[in-house]
Design a protein with these regions (language model features):
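Conserved mixed alpha/beta catalytic, RNA-binding, or beta-rich assembly cores of soluble enzyme
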Residues: 2-372
Length: 372
């Protein structure tokens, strides 16, 4: 009788990369992980910041590693030691899902098999290095979840060179959606056909976008080939559970952080802060939602409609939103940044006094949050 060798008995090691909050909010991430655990040992990691919020809300932080902020392609590279890697996503459409998968595969260039399971587009696709094992897993996922098996698309269709400029096309955009680059909102879509033009690391134009100039001014050097482009809300789905708010921090270390762009980096920027000053409507909305899970209060300086900013938004307990006259949030924020270099506020209330002194009669209203 043939005896089993160690190799025969070794279970598959399956890497899983979860992208974005929607695949968590809909429940598919957990369902897929549990399905894959029936076929091997699973190591699950996350890509992106708002996905972290969804994982915390769903109570899955013990099953999905959210300790580091890594892009999907970086996470795929990190898991190359596994027998295969599964990319879980929930795209707005089948088209955008296929484009996303192709971009991740092209950037990661993994050595092991990579497949994508997309609950938004309802498909499974082999992205790289197909093998007998990965084909079995892909077919099984498609069959058990009722998805179609599709061919991956070409990765470079959305990028081209025009003279000395780089042009990148976005897929699946709807008119009226906000367009962000690396977490900074640069404008609003006016068409379904959206293209962004960059030269020498700066965005110099766009097609199908009503550009927001002060959003562009906040952007540092941008490599458009690898930038994270997003249309619409940073979290299109409601969480499965009530947001899990962190206990309000009582630390007296007096450390604070200022976030005036790249709000999706809030976990890293504010990890040991007692409070955070956020500048701008979009930045305050995103950072406030993220920091509420850490229990870090926010002093937000905004100039927009508070109903629009706070609708469905969870702010940390003890936060304060200062609404100023239109066009003044960035100016006041810049002044606060300058002053705080020499006069560092030790508490949120002290920082609020600084804002009152700087803003004066430009303040429209001050609203305190109770964390809801």
């Amino acid at each position: 009788m043939r005896t089993s060798s160690a190799a025969d008995e070794r279970r598959l090691l399956i890497g899983v990369v979860i992208h974005g909050p929607e695949v968590v909010d809909t429940g598919f991430a957990l369902q897929a992980i549990e399905w894959l655990e029936g076929h091997g040992d699973v190591v699950a990691v996350l890509g992106g910041t708002m996905g972290r919020v969804a994982v915390i809300d769903a109570g899955l932080a013990d099953r999905i590693d959210i300790s580091r902020r890594r892009s999907p392609s970086q996470s795929v590279q990190d898991l190359q030691h596994s027998d295969l890697t599964v990319l879980l996503n929930h795209a707005k459409s089948r088209e955008t899902g296929l484009v996303f998968g192709a971009i991740v595969a092209a950037r990661a260039r993994p050595m092991n098999p990579l497949i994508q399971a997309d609950s938004g587009g309802r498909f499974v696709a082999a992205l790289a290095n197909s093998s007998g094992i990965s084909n079995v897993i892909a077919d099984g996922l498609a069959s058990d979840f009722g998805f179609d098996v599709l061919d991956a698309c070409m990765p470079d269709d959305n990028l081209r060179q025009e003279g000395d400029a780089i042009v990148r096309r976005m897929s699946g955009v709807l008119p009226g959606e906000r367009i962000s680059v690396n977490g900074t909102v640069i404008g609003t879509a006016t068409d379904t056909c959206v293209e962004i033009v960059a030269r020498d690391g700066r965005i110099v134009g766009a097609r199908g976008i009503d550009l927001k100039m002060h959003g562009l001014e906040k952007l540092p050097h941008v490599d458009l080939r690898y930038a994270i482009l997003r249309s619409g809300s940073v979290r299109r789905t409601a969480g499965m559970l009530k947001p899990r708010l962190g206990s309000i921090r009582k630390s007296g270390n007096g450390r604070f952080a200022i976030i005036d762009h790249a709000a999706e980096d809030s976990f890293e920027i504010a990890s040991d802060a007692s409070f955070v000053i956020t500048i701008g409507d979009d930045t305050t909305a995103i950072a406030g939602d993220v920091l509420s899970r850490l229990g870090i209060p926010v002093l937000g300086i905004v100039d927009g409609d508070l109903d629009g900013i706070c609708s469905g938004l969870v702010l940390p307990e003890g936060s304060v939103i200062v609404r100023v006259r239109a066009g003044n949030d960035d100016k006041i924020g810049k002044a606060i940044k300058s002053i705080s270099e020499n006069r560092r506020p030790s508490s949120l209330d002290e920082a609020l006094d600084m804002v009152r002194d700087v803003a004066g009669d430009r303040i429209v209203s001050v609203i305190r949050s109770d964390g809801r």
